[in-house]
Regions:
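Extracytoplasmic copper-binding redox domains, predominantly the cupredoxin/blue-copper superfamily
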Residues: 2-16, 20-115
Length: 115
């Protein structure tokens, strides 16, 4: 009788683990990156290089606990300080290469190429 109890418990545990694994495999990652989005995390822009078509709006999202800014080196755009989970958007209308950096942490750099 005790042996049947342990067998049943083992089968239920294995079944639960397999169900959980199957469900987890089908779920998107919690931090899945949106198209045309640059994530600011660990004092880096990710991706560090992004190519978009003219007319595209790019969104930067700060996932760090520290504030960051999004600055174009040619002065075309400059965000306010973004706290954690804040976003900044800019629509690129002209083709070209746009160098971006954080005004607070200038070693953080990225490039947006607009076609």
């Amino acid at each position: 009788m005790l042996l049947n109890y342990f067998r049943r418990a083992f089968v239920v545990s294995c079944g639960s683990a397999m169900l959980l694994a199957a469900l987890a495999a089908g779920l998107p990652a919690a931090q899945a990156q949106e198209p045309n989005q640059v994530v600011i995390k660990n004092f880096m822009f990710s991706p560090m290089a992004l190519t978009v078509k003219a007319g595209t709006t790019v969104t930067w999202k700060n996932m760090d606990g520290e504030p960051h800014t999004v600055v174009n080196d040619a002065g075309i755009f400059h965000s306010t300080a973004l706290d954690q989970n804040d976003t900044f958007q800019f629509t690129f209308v002209k083709p070209g290469v746009y160098n971006v950096f954080c005004g607070i942490h200038p070693y953080m750099k990225a490039t947006i190429t607009v076609q």
